[in-house]
Amino acid sequence: MSARPFSTGPLVGRAIPHESAHLHVSGKAAYVDDLPELAGTLHAAAGLSTVAHGRIKNLDLAAVRAYPGVRCVLTAADIPGENNCGPILHDDPIIASDAIQFYGQVIFAVAADTRDAARQAVRLAKVEYDAETPILSMDAAIAAESWVLPPFAMQRGPVDPAFANAPHRLSGTAHVGGQEHFYLEGQVSYVQPKEDHTLHLICSTQHPTEMQQLVSHALGWRSHQISVETRRMGGGFGGKESQSAQWACLAALLAVRTGKPVKIRLDRDDDMIATGKRHGFQYQWQSAFDDAGRLLGLKLEMASNCGYSADLSGPVNDRTICHIDNAYYLDAVALKSLRCKTNTVSNTAFRGFGGPQGMFVIETVLDDIARHLGRDPLEIRQINFYDVEPGARSTTPYGMLVEDNVAPALVAELAAECDYAARRAAIAEFNAGSPIIKRGLALTPVKFGISFNATHYNQAGALVHVYTDGTVLVSHGG
């Protein structure tokens, strides 16, 4: 909360500083690990699997329990409620009970007097595995028909006739890798037992309500017994939407078993091993187009590496499907989406939430058409834009009317103001005389859906308090 001076001047076009900017730049902003710890606070660490696929034959934790400072060791058998932290499907165990599905999966957890003691103790576990051959790539998953969710197919228009009658056809493949969120503040939760059989969670999360729900399920408690506080995060970008739940659940389970406050903060190496990333995608496509470069038909198969569980892969892939058109009209299109299950960490939300992976492939297709025809890539993009006025070329492949389409006029204005044509010509001249060092220039439009595909998510609430001294307090969700 911050106090801002009252102003009667215009606000549109005026920079408004972030309410915590002065705290950030001065180093006074308090994150979870900066908060004073209550007396008796224990520190947690997780024991991680060292195989990618298999089963636990024997888990010997005697040396872990005997390590100085260790107060509690937690296994899947000790979870009183539901052993699940999956946001949609119940396929994401908090602690693996038998089956190992990726390298770095949690197989037990420890609470100790100090963080160093907890981290040292988890290394003493003696684990015997019955290892199996893992599926580590999308190609291997496709060959084995290994899916976290069933494949999805969509078609609009007469695709085969469009290809049969097209003067030009191309085919190609592409791959875009995953990405680590690399938030500056790692996954961290601090759980404090309170009176009357309740818990207070201080958690670095993008989804406090889901933390409340999943922690209550793991404990077998009611939601009103769990309160969750998130003052600020040191970065999230989607990596703390569903992925923070596992660590909140572990800290809560240990806090209840010990009756002590418990904090878990992952080291960067464990954070990168055990938490999900952006979905990597690979594509195979065929395009049909005319002499002007206008797309007449598109056949596309795209596969995503979802990891070992569904997590948010369903809505991520759905959003990818809804963005394969970007700003362009696709008259005849046949699409197949494969949601690959691999023995890797379960991938999750990341900025754009599947949208960038969809836009990437259509931009790649248009670039190939431009190279084939010897045309400027921007010209090919402009030819394929949705029409400005609603009509036959203004409907997306999934049946939505594109309205208020400013992309054609905006791109034309930007190209003129930045002197695009002259700069492209100068770059071509430079590249012709430079065999090693090359220059480039691109202008790429973006059409991005700002709402959820599930309509009921597109709502929010706010509470406004107007006080007698004229000040205002606004509380809002999200």
Regions found by a protein language model. Give the residues of each.
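Alpha-helical support elements that line or immediately flank enzyme active sites
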Residues: 46-74, 108-128, 189-258, 315-325, ...
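Beta-strand segments within the central parallel beta-sheet cores of soluble alpha/beta enzyme folds
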Residues: 76, 225-231, 259-269, 296-301, ...
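Glycine-rich loop/linker segments at domain edges
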Residues: 14, 20-23, 27, 154-189, ...
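Phosphate/diphosphate-binding loops
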Residues: 106, 112-114, 256-308
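Flexible, low-hydrophobicity surface segments
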Residues: 1-154, 169-172, 257
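Accessory "access/gating" subregions that flank catalytic or transport cores
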Residues: 175-180, 382-465
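Short Pro/Gly-enriched beta-strand edge/turn motifs at strand-loop
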Residues: 80-82, 165-179, 264-271, 438-449
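Short, surface-exposed loop/turn segments at secondary-structure boundaries that line and modulate
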Residues: 74-105, 147, 210, 228-249, ...
